[in-house]
Amino acid sequence: MDREMKRHYTLLVDFLGKILGPDYEVALHELLDDSNEIIAIANGELTGRHLGSPLSNKMLEFLTSRLYETQDYVLRFESTSVTGKKLCSNSLFIKDPHGRLVGLLCINFDSSRYRELSARVMDLCGSLLTPGAPSGTNLIV
């Protein structure tokens, strides 16, 4: 990845991290012959990753399968953080002008607090209904 491309994508990582918020990790991986590591990251506390962290196993699978030769990106695949959180992940394959893969822009979303909130709301709704009562007869006072 050349200097200008790094600058552009590093700015994008910072921008996306700020507008998407703490439930989204945004990571830029540079792919070199001798190392593949994170060179920019926003909200890394979500997964515990930091500058210099290696590629995830899922990303290594994508590289090994050469998925980038037929697709520009992969959307909404499940991954797991080092802390065991289930994440919704998305990855953009970054290519140079010659079509050679030089990086990955990865966005990982932790929806756990929204799933927990949804479950609590459903529990609340269920506790307001009297079991066995005919529909439409439950009054909420």
Model-predicted segments: where are they?
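Juxtadomain coupling helices with adjacent low-complexity linkers
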Residues: 1-19, 104, 109-141
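Short amphipathic alpha-helical patches
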Residues: 39-43, 89, 131
